[in-house]
Regions:
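Noncatalytic alpha-helical scaffold of FAD-dependent oxidoreductases
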Residues: 1-259
């Protein structure tokens, strides 16, 4: 099924509930753990949100963007960028993963240290519950203590508690400067010590910290030989760190404090 609106999703869910037919929500199909694969038994309805792909509104002054569940993550990023804002969720499949799937799996991405998981980037949700009832929870408020906060049950539930149809997403100011560095470390324990040092000295400037093993670098060299490697031979353990700052800060000088 390819619904184009929340009302159509509600109609489909209501009909399936009455007929006792299961539903498998489908986003961009980028998950690699089989979450979008139906179990053996009676065939369920595959419900794709790909036609619900509108960015409904961007409230630049509030740092909020309202997107339907079928919007591709890269399109959310582009809509924010057009307003000189940042939607900081970034991952390898951002060109095909959809925001509903990101929310349903509580995706982390590369900037989770600074901005948090997808859960931390969501202010409100619109969803269709198993009965077909529509949950209208597209709040744009940072501070909202009215009633039960059902979005946190739905985020990460992989469609088992309801089908997310739209979300109010939290935007951030775009960093003026971004600095990156690649460092060789002796072990994962040494990487943790480096991360602790970086956060002690640079605080919220640390936006990314990835520990890579030699095997991963070797795979990259084997399958993408055109990618230039920073080392003649890959070290056993490597850390890639990213820091961001406002215009007044120098990211290179900040990174040099770690050496």
């Amino acid at each position: 099924a390819l619904p184009r609106s929340t009302a159509e999703v509600s109609t489909l869910v209501t009909a399936c509930a009455q007929a006792r037919v299961g539903i498998v929500p489908f986003g961009g199909g980028t998950g690699l753990v089989g979450g979008q694969v139906a179990e053996d038994g009676p065939k369920p309805l595959i419900l794709s949100l790909e036609k619900m792909n509108a960015v409904r509104e961007v409230y630049a002054e509030e740092n909020v963007l309202i997107a339907e569940a079928g919007v591709i993550l890269a399109d959310v990023q582009a809509a924010a960028d057009a307003q000189n804002r940042l939607f900081p969720l970034s991952l390898a499949a951002e060109g095909s993963a959809r925001i509903g799937g990101n929310l349903a799996t509580n995706a982390g991405g590369t900037s989770v240290l600074r901005y948090g998981n997808t859960r931390d980037l969501c202010l409100g949700l619109e969803a269709v519950m198993p009965s077909g009832e529509i949950l209208n929870g597209l709040s744009r408020l940072r501070k909202n203590n009215t009633g039960y906060d059902l979005r946190h049950l739905l985020i990460g539930s992989e469609g088992t508690l309801g089908i997310i149809t739209a979300a109010a997403l939290k935007l951030s100011p775009k960093p003026a400067k971004i600095g990156t560095a690649m460092l060789v470390v002796e072990s994962p324990k040494a990487a943790l010590s480096l991360l602790s040092l970086a956060r002690d000295q640079l605080g919220e400037m640390v936006s990314g910290f990835e520990l890579m093993h030699k095997q991963g670098i070797d795979f990259l060299t084997q399958y993408m030989p055109e990618v230039r490697q920073p080392f003649d031979a890959a070290p056993e353990w490597t850390v890639l760190i990213e820091v961001v700052s406002p215009a007044a800060m120098n990211t290179q000088s900040a990174l040099e404090t770690l050496f």
